[in-house]
């Protein structure tokens, strides 16, 4: 049976051809290799039509033009040569579109990303809608790749090399007005007239490329180009720590095209695409992409979720304010905040105002839309307005009696169907639900700070939580724009449990004489966004260390922090960034560059600050403990799968994405190698490094956690 075409041709009476893109059975248009023959058949018809005046590409999907190429195509390639051929085929198809003798216009509404933008760049002109859903970008670098269908060559010539490099190196997505300002699109119009605006443009002569700004013209010349690539190369190396080969190849390919011409540039692009597709970094990043896509489809349980129309939040602090913001402004739900102090409510409301006002200032949001979103949030000092809330999120202090009291009050003041979700980071959910009249409607919903930025949430059912409560809470998390993983109700849950030994070991090395900046730099070089000491300062030393005694009580001395170190620091009124002094000293609020190590820390904790370990040795000690604990969590069914374990670590604590998560990383090293390293460290530093039983067994059997396919589990 012949596959339905994703591209259909309709020639209007005014001799403008409309090519409609609609991949059958898919929500998103993605480009597949097999579509090339469909497009070529249409191009042949267009060339044979001597009356033709112009061509418009438009999508039939309600919220995307083309979201990119189908990533599975790359996974199907076994060699760099096969992936290179894939890129050359894409380049050739784009060249054939560009070579049409009449004006070709892309009418863009919604996501126009990756191969979608490369198709739009191959057109002679572009019109897009002013809708918030419309974004344009080349995000391939986030998968360890570069644009392989001409994007590295066409974009710099259209908008200038420095602007193009910023887009390609970061995967930055532009909104419609930004795209217009940079010359990436020729016009921005309301969605209702998109097609007609594109048709009008197609009836004119081919849009002439707008002259580049003087700065971009200078930077495209030999002297300016040399200076630009040197500067951008340095900046990129500092940002990636050499862990992402794609950025280096992007610079090389763009420079080749500018210095030696487009033919050499296209050759370099296809070759680099093929080689990058085979790198372990790209494979790991693509695996994370597939895993996160799967998690987003996972409903958490077999039961259908209950309706969600309105949410209540207990506590207007930093977490409560952040949760209110994502619930109202991302999920679009009515939110009622209760705090015993009116100032708490004001703080929470201001939090959302600040976030939205920032978007208005950056012209990402209209003032009217800001006001509409803010109107969803209200506050109270009692339970007025809580009677019919579907779900209540508790974000009060980490105190068991207080949280149990909140459960009792919610059951007394809310409907019988209302779910109680606790944002605890350390207290067992079963204990919080111990005196509940409806324990099946009590669950944990653990957000990470800052709430609006951190993509992960942990959903923690206790033994009596119903399947519907799980499904409803997962549904809410997704509406809030979060990636949820369901974890077991054990001390520390998953993320904090694997993070604690990592941070403990960093502090232990500090007491042994390693310098703060050396420890942090070693883990940043390894691939974490910030080092463990800085992370503790950012979270708050008081907050971040509160969980250590809980974990120590549950799991024993392997979670013990170095004696008296934390208490010495807290007794010296050091809380981290929030009070201006922790392991680092901080300058004026908001000036992150003013951070510097406080030398007074060393005598305070009785350390010399004269290190002996290399950066890889420092990283090895911290990371191995994290890996060992992650495997224990899998063994104890704290996490449901290695997929959830990898996603939780990457999205929850910034485990290096290019390594694919703790379980992918163990597989890449081999369980045998991990066990050997841990046994060596146990001999050197103590029993906390003893590899867990499952790792030892896997080592003996030569097993791995993941099968070789992208999404199957062992």
Swiss-Prot record:
Protein origin, superkingdom: Bacteria
Site entry: Important for catalytic activity: 118, 140
InterPro entries assigned: 3-OHacyl-CoA_DH_CS (IPR006180), 3-OHacyl-CoA_DH_NAD-bd (IPR006176), 3HC_DH_C (IPR006108), 6-PGluconate_DH-like_C_sf (IPR008927), ClpP/crotonase-like_dom_sf (IPR029045), Enoyl-CoA_hydra/iso (IPR001753), FA_oxidation_alpha_subunit (IPR050136), FadJ (IPR012802)
Compartments it resides in: Cytoplasm
Catalytic activity: a (3S)-3-hydroxyacyl-CoA = a (2E)-enoyl-CoA + H2O; a 4-saturated-(3S)-3-hydroxyacyl-CoA = a (3E)-enoyl-CoA + H2O; a (3S)-3-hydroxyacyl-CoA + NAD(+) = a 3-oxoacyl-CoA + NADH + H(+); (3S)-3-hydroxybutanoyl-CoA = (3R)-3-hydroxybutanoyl-CoA
GO molecular function: 3-hydroxybutyryl-CoA epimerase activity; enoyl-CoA hydratase activity; long-chain-3-hydroxyacyl-CoA dehydrogenase activity; NAD+ binding
Record region (Enoyl-CoA hydratase): 1-190
Cellular component, GO, one term: cytoplasm
Keyword Lipid metabolism assigned: yes
Alphabetical UniProt keywords: Cytoplasm, Fatty acid metabolism, Isomerase, Lipid degradation, Lipid metabolism, Lyase, Multifunctional enzyme, NAD, Oxidoreductase
Gene Ontology process terms (BP): fatty acid beta-oxidation
Region of interest (3-hydroxyacyl-CoA dehydrogenase), residue spans: 306-714
Pathway this chain belongs to: Lipid metabolism; fatty acid beta-oxidation
PANTHER family associated with the record: TRIFUNCTIONAL ENZYME SUBUNIT ALPHA (PTHR43612), TRIFUNCTIONAL ENZYME SUBUNIT ALPHA, MITOCHONDRIAL (PTHR43612:SF3)
Function: Catalyzes the formation of a hydroxyacyl-CoA by addition of water on enoyl-CoA. Also exhibits 3-hydroxyacyl-CoA epimerase and 3-hydroxyacyl-CoA dehydrogenase activities.
Annotated family: In the N-terminal section; belongs to the enoyl-CoA hydratase/isomerase family.
Complex formation: Heterotetramer of two alpha chains (FadJ) and two beta chains (FadI).
Protein name (record): Fatty acid oxidation complex subunit alpha
Native source organism of the sequence: Escherichia coli (strain SMS-3-5 / SECEC)
Lineage of the organism: Bacteria, Pseudomonadati, Pseudomonadota, Gammaproteobacteria, Enterobacterales
